[in-house]
Amino acid sequence: MKKWMLAICLMFINGICEAADCFDLAGRDYKIDPDLLRAISWKESRYRVNAIGINPVTGYGSGLMQVDSQHFNELARYGIKPEHLTTDPCMNIYTGAYYLAIAFKKWGVSWEAVGAYNAGFRKTERQNQRRLAYASEVYRIYTWIKSSKGIRVPTTKKSLSQINSVQKN
């Protein structure tokens, strides 16, 4: 179902994105806090649309959300080419949100799942440490984004869903 949603969203994305913030749109469509998507994008690319990052294990990451080249075969089934990810910011943000939603579905809405966006799902101590380090940095960026908007984020080790519910009250 989510794969069909991704395909449909991506077909209409170009026209929509000219008038709205793609982080907000992708967040709405995937039920992910747009500021979390912004934090991940800052961590991954410093908001550089055409960023290319080398990944010694799987190849390279592309664009704002550093979508990994290991996903290119799957994305090709939806008509998404690697060059789209570095030239179409909205497509890149939606694609990153799609893969984050997969992590949330697999591990729940948690910081561990945020870490898996970057470090994968392998259950080894090394990957656990990589997930923790990545999620900690994203959390720091996320709290900075929220504080710049006057929103206080709890400093306890709450899950993302608990933090999001606090912010909506």
Curated annotation (Swiss-Prot):
Any Pfam family matching the protein: SLT
Family matches, as SUPFAM superfamilies: Lysozyme-like
Domain of life: Bacteria
Keywords, ordered alphabetically: Plasmid
The UniProt record lists the keyword Nucleotide-binding: no
Coiled-coil features, chain-numbered ranges: none
Signal peptide: none
Family stated for the protein in its record: Belongs to the IagB/IpgF/P19 family.
Name recorded for this polypeptide: X polypeptide
Organism: Escherichia coli
Upper taxonomic lineage: Bacteria, Pseudomonadati, Pseudomonadota, Gammaproteobacteria, Enterobacterales
Gene from which this protein is expressed: X
